[in-house]
Amino acid sequence: MEKLKEFLKGVRDELKRVVWPSRELVVKATISVIIFSLAIGVYLWILDLTFTKIISFILSLRGSL
C-alpha cells in the first residue's frame, strides 16, 4: 500500500511539471489534423475511383474477346 501512495505522489508531482498547450494551440492543431485527414481521404477516394474504373475497363475488354 505504501508503494501505491508513493507512486501516486510521483504521478501528481509529474503532472504539476507538465507544460500544457494553450487552448488556441490545441484548436489550431485539431483543425489542421481534420483538414489534413479530409484531404488524404479525398485523395484516396479519387485514387480508388480511378483504379476501379481502370479495372472495370480492362475486365470489359476481356469479356468482349
UniProtKB/Swiss-Prot annotation:
Keywords noted in UniProt: Cell inner membrane, Cell membrane, Membrane, Protein transport, Translocation, Transmembrane, Transmembrane helix, Transport
Q: Where in the cell is it found?
A: Cell inner membrane
**Organism superkingdom:** Bacteria
Q: Which residues lie on this side of the membrane: Periplasmic?
A: 60-65
GO cellular component entries = plasma membrane
- Kindly report every residue range on the membrane side named Cytoplasmic: 1-27
Q: Which GO terms describe its biological process?
A: intracellular protein transmembrane transport; protein secretion; protein targeting; protein transport by the Sec complex
TM regions (residue ranges)? 28-59
Q: How does the protein's chain sit in the membrane according to the entry?
A: Single-pass membrane protein
A single GO molecular-function term is:
protein transmembrane transporter activity
Q: How does it assemble?
A: Component of the Sec protein translocase complex. Heterotrimer consisting of SecY, SecE and SecG subunits. The heterotrimers can form oligomers, although 1 heterotrimer is thought to be able to translocate proteins. Interacts with SecDF, and other proteins may be involved. The channel interacts with SecA via subunit SecY.
Quote the function comment for this protein: Essential subunit of the protein translocation channel SecYEG. Clamps together the 2 halves of SecY. May contact the channel plug during translocation.
> Could you say which protein family the record assigns here?
Belongs to the SecE/SEC61-gamma family.
The protein depicted here goes by the name: Protein translocase subunit SecE
Organism of derivation: Aquifex aeolicus (strain VF5)
The record lists the lineage as: Bacteria, Pseudomonadati, Aquificota, Aquificia, Aquificales
